[in-house]
């Protein structure tokens, strides 16, 4: 802190006086510093006690600690509670005290003015204030006490640094007060340590008791909840187990019922077979007995047996035809699923075609017409003029040649289209079209009769072209055609895409020839498979 010129002169004069006589002349400024220091200490103590009293009213534990360990704290708390509980008494005492203080103040003002005048005239012997700091072990003390001791040491150091000159009597009293304060603070520190230790022990026991109580309560609640959850889980498990067992029992009963029905059906079938055998045996015995006498009846039986065999043959043909149609439908559906599956890059349907060919030949044998227009062969008719002596009829009808069916024609076309060749999926066709982008751009720049130089030039300039995407307008330039084809392939519109590519001419058409062949093969196979499906459904 910088000092003025006047203060420097006073300090110099004070130093010279102390050197010569050992005493210093008290100045008005030195007494003013001491008064400020005194008021600072008083205000700090007042604030400390006031804060402790106010916080003690809010926290009972701190109030006990404050009244037991801080000097004069208990009396101040009792006084505060006395006037706080009886506010009218406080007003009466405050009024009486105010009147007494006003009288004392008036008398003090007159006396103080006289004493000040006498002090100015008299020169007292004073000493430089030098206080010892508070050396108290605060390693395990309360943090607030540490803060108080630190603040007091800072205050003592500031007083020592200010070089205050005070009278000898006041110097001795201050030294004594410092020693008393050191003793009281040491006692307070020990008391605080002991109280803190007792408080920690008591609080620890309370916390342990509280924790034990909470543990017991939580334990009982947990056991209750656990028991409730276990009972609920047992009920749910019991219910689920009951449902599962009922379901298993129902399934077993159903299986046993089906088994009994199957056994019953087998028994009925076996019984019918046995009855037929017995019937045949009886018929055979009767025929053997009456063979010689009843040939007419034997011929009637023979004709009925022939009719029965024809009916059986027709039934077997119908069943075989239906089975052949079912197998044809299954094979056609298999081919359709394979050619429409995008997970397969290419498909070979030679095996399916051979099966279709075999089933078609089998079906054509069932669809053969008789040699006569009425559906029956003349050899099967009775009373015919061509009947011989042995009862046999020679058929003179010319065999009819049936025209090839649509099914066989479609199969032949499908075999010629796909024999030894693979059918690409829509995704594979789209990918191959994307691979033609660079060659397509190069071909779009080539003249009709281009040489090697034209090829190289078109290849170089094609690197600077951009490929169009999306669905542009119906323009005829190569980029628009390429974009429309890509968009049609993206939505699996292969027919329109092939029409766009086929309409190209010159080098672009030549570049796309292999792609056109694969796409046309895919379209032809799809159309032929659709024709086969429709024809089989009509049969």
Swiss-Prot record:
Membrane topology label: Single-pass membrane protein
Q: Which domain of life is it from?
A: Eukaryota
Gene Ontology BP terms: cristae formation
| Entry keyword annotation includes DNA repair | no
What subcellular compartments does it reside in?
Mitochondrion inner membrane
Positions on the Mitochondrial intermembrane side per record topology: 57-539
Q: What is its main location?
A: mitochondrion
Residues annotated as transmembrane: 37-56
Give the GO cellular component terms, alphabetically: MICOS complex
Instruction: Outline where the chain's transit peptide begins and ends.
Output: 1-16
- Sections of the chain in a coiled coil: 172-264
Show which residues sit on the Mitochondrial matrix side of the membrane. 17-36
Concerning Pfam families, the annotation shows:
Mitofilin
- UniProt entry keywords in alphabetical sequence: Coiled coil, Membrane, Mitochondrion, Mitochondrion inner membrane, Transit peptide, Transmembrane, Transmembrane helix
Family, as annotated: Belongs to the MICOS complex subunit Mic60 family.
Q: What does this protein do?
A: Component of the MICOS complex, a large protein complex of the mitochondrial inner membrane that plays crucial roles in the maintenance of crista junctions, inner membrane architecture, and formation of contact sites to the outer membrane. Plays a role in keeping cristae membranes connected to the inner boundary membrane. Also promotes protein import via the mitochondrial intermembrane space assembly (MIA) pathway.
Q: How does it assemble?
A: Component of the mitochondrial contact site and cristae organizing system (MICOS) complex.
Record's protein name:
MICOS complex subunit MIC60
């Amino acid at each position: 802190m910088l000092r003025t010129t006047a203060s420097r002169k006073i300090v110099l004069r004070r130093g010279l006086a102390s050197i010569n006589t050992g005493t210093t002349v008290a100045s008005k400024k030195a007494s003013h510093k001491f008064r400020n220091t005194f008021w600072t200490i008083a205000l700090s103590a007042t604030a400390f006690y006031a804060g402790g009293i106010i916080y003690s009213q809010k926290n009972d534990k701190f109030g006990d600690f404050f009244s037991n360990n801080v000097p004069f704290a208990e009396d101040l708390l009792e006084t505060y509670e006395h006037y706080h509980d009886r506010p009218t008494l406080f007003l009466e005492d405050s009024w009486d005290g105010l009147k007494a203080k006003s009288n004392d103040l008036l008398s003090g003002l007159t006396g103080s003015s006289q004493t000040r005048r006498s002090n100015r005239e008299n020169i007292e012997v004073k000493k430089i204030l030098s206080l010892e700091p508070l050396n108290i072990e605060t390693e395990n003390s309360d943090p607030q006490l540490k803060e108080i001791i630190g603040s007091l040491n800072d205050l003592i150091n500031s007083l020592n640094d200010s070089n205050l000159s005070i009278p000898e009597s006041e110097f001795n009293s201050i030294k004594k007060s410092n020693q008393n304060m050191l003793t009281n603070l040491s006692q307070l520190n020990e008391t605080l340590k002991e109280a803190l230790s007792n408080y920690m022990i008591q609080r620890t026991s309370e916390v342990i008791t509280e924790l034990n109580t909470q543990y017991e309560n939580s334990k009982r609640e947990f056991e209750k909840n656990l028991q409730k959850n276990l009972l609920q889980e047992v009920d749910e498990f019991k219910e689920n187990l009951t449902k599962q067992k009922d379901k298993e029992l129902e399934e077993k009963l159903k299986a046993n019922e089906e088994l009994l029905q199957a056994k019953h059906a087998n028994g009925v079938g076996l019984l019918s077979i046995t009855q037929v055998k017995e019937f045949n045996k009886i018929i055979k015995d009767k025929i053997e007995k009456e063979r010689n006498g009843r040939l007419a009846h034997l011929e009637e039986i023979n004709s009925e047996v022939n009719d029965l065999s024809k009916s059986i043959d027709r039934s077997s043909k119908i069943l075989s035809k239906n089975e052949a149609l079912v197998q044809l439908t299954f094979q056609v559906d298999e081919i359709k699923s394979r050619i429409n599956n995008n997970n397969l890059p290419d498909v070979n349907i030679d095996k399916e075609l051979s099966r279709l060919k075999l089933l078609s030949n089998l079906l054509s044998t069932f669809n053969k017409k008789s040699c006569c227009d009425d559906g029956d062969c003349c050899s099967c008719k009775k009373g015919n003029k061509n009947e011989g002596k042995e009862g046999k009829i020679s058929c003179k009808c010319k065999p009819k040649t049936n025209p090839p069916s649509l099914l066989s024609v479609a199969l032949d076309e499908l075999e010629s289209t796909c024999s030894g060749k693979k059918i690409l999926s829509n995704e594979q066709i789209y990918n191959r079209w994307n691979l033609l982008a660079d060659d397509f751009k190069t071909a779009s720049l080539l003249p009709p009769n281009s040489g090697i130089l034209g090829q190289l030039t078109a290849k170089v300039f094609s690197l600077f072209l951009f490929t169009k995407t999306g669905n542009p307008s119906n323009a005829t330039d190569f980029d628009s055609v390429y974009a429309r084809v890509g968009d049609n392939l993206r939505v699996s519109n292969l027919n329109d895409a092939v029409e766009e590519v086929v309409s190209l001419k010159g080098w672009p058409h030549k570049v796309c020839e292999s792609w056109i062949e694969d796409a046309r093969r895919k379209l032809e196979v799809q159309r032929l498979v659709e024709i086969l499906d429709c024809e089989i459904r009509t049969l």
